[in-house]
Amino acid sequence: IAEPVRAYQVLTKPGDAAHRVISAKRQFASRRTAIAALFAGLLIVIAGVGLAWWQPWFERVAPADPARMAYALPDKPSIAVLPFDNLSADKEQEYFSDGVTEDIITDLSKISGLFVVARNSTFIYKGQPVNIRQVAEELGVRYVLEGSVRRAEEKIRITAQLIDATTGGHIWAERYDRELKDVFTVQADVARQVAKALAVTLKANENERLFQKYTANIDAYDVFLQARRTVVGGSRDNILRGEKLFSRVIELDPKFAGGYAGLSFNLSVQVRLQYSDSPSADVLRAFDLAKQAVVIDRDFAWGHIALGGAYLANGDADGAVDAVRQALALEPGGYEANLFMGFYLQFAGEPALAVEHLQLARRLSPVETVRDLAFMAWAQFMNRNYTETVRLLTDMSRKFPHSKIASLMACRAAAYALLERPEEAAVVVKKLLDAHPKFNLSQWEFGKLWKLEENRTRLYNAAKKAGIPEFPVGE
């Protein structure tokens, strides 16, 4: 060979050359395919990251401005749960979707690391076009949870999505297709996933309580949801309807604490508002029922609140406070636990502390109800802030003109009397006696519930000064 030839390997057989050329082509093609696959995978990852940020499957909302919020954002992650839409074919299932929403709010309230707005304030947006920015600014929260419920026979589909109102972005979403009997597990998982998305660590007992089943009887739960709606409205007809429904819950599942707690709470309210025909017997029943609820499930906060109501109806304000303290331990961010703690404390002779709890309840539920205004009015009266008492009860009569609760009308008249405004007191007394002709101080059981004699006497004398009769008219 005149010139040297570079060779990697000498092939001695004629067929080897063709074989090696084909093999080399295959190896090259394989490498090219691998590179292409790697490049395609990289593009998918980049696209995925971009999509996760852009979220084209969600409609981004206009961000809320913390400076325009009605309340300063709390130190904890704050959240409002909007009423879940009822997408069931049967529109009568509205109570069920409302119940799912309420239970998710309750479960979230069990998590001490969250600030959760109460049902009373979020349900004012029910049936309205949702404006996340408006909700966040009016309620003073950073996060909003919304979703839907579809129920078909023994199946449910629940969707939920969590929005950061300050950015307008969605930070978590999920769809659950489950058996109806698994509704409690779904509700608990929504609460847990929300906490996880907000980087809130659950305490061991909080995680355990989230996944407790209140009842395995879905029919009992169904009736309980209907019965619970009667608690919100304070009319006599509504309360009497609630009594029947809670009794039905107990029949369907004697091991469900909710039926006993609800019926106990209902009877205590009847006694307190003087709707009861047998107050002494109803107080005893309320006690027994609440105690059964607590024995069945010590972690059911409403059972302790109901027990507090029974204590108060029996004139034991200290017992009422002790009972609700247990509810607060179970639901530290619970609106009702703080509300009733405030209500019972002023009966126990601690109106200043009562006002603090009621202010927290107000922050948890910025949209006021008759109950919110009434409880704060009583606390301010016992705190000797009569001007604020009058303002609250005047505001209540303006917002809720059909609410003519005798005790509250008497409280307003008494406050006017202590402010030396006899003409205005007389106007309120006339309205009181027009609505409740038999009302008199000697039979005013509610006026006897205060622990301190000084408070009972102050209220009684002020009501008498306002012109409320001491004894039934004509006697």
PLM region spans:
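Short, Lys/Arg-rich N-terminal segment immediately upstream of the first membrane anchor
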Residues: A24-R31
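Short, flexible loop/turn segments with low-complexity composition
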Residues: I22, E206-F211, P472-E475
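Terminal, low-structured helical/coil segments at or just beyond the last alpha-helical repeat
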Residues: L441-E475
